UniProtKB/Swiss-Prot annotation:
Organism lineage string: Bacteria, Bacillati, Bacillota, Bacilli, Bacillales
Protein name per UniProt: Nucleoid-associated protein BA_0020/GBAA_0020/BAS0022
Coiled coil: none
CC per GO annotation: bacterial nucleoid; cytosol
NCBIfam families linked: DNA_YbaB_EbfC
Family: Belongs to the YbaB/EbfC family.
Source organism, top-level taxon: Bacteria
A Pfam family matched in the record: YbaB_DNA_bd
Length: 109
């Protein structure tokens, strides 16, 4: 009886180690994937990676109005939030396969 139990425990440990390696690889890949958030009909574009790091902000020249800087700020904010939301979705879909069925609190993955 004991021997079978230890074998199961060893198998479980091997599976957990394999899953840890796969999760680490998935985390690394998230940093390489990008998402794009936009606002103002594409006048502002924000590019972020799967780690929610902003990589680039693009502003089309015609949206820059020195008389209305507030609108430009609002558009940059909206595009940034859009990019971060998409980065969250990417992270959840990528990492969620590892936590499916674990019933983690607070919507973690």
């Amino acid at each position: 009886m004991m021997r079978g139990g230890m074998g199961n425990m060893n198998n479980m440990m091997k599976q957990m180690q394999k899953m840890q390696k796969e999760m680490a690889k998935a985390q690394e890949e998230l940093g390489e994937k990008t998402v794009e958030g936009t606002a103002g009909g594409g006048m502002i574009t924000v590019i972020a990676n799967g780690h929610k790091q902003i990589l680039e902000v693009k502003v089309k020249e015609e949206v820059v109005d020195p008389e209305d800087i507030e609108m430009l700020q609002d558009l940059v904010l909206a595009a940034t939030n859009d990019a971060l939301k998409k980065a969250d979705e990417l992270s959840n879909s990528t990492m969620g396969k590892f936590t499916k069925g674990l019933n983690l609190p607070g919507g973690m993955f």
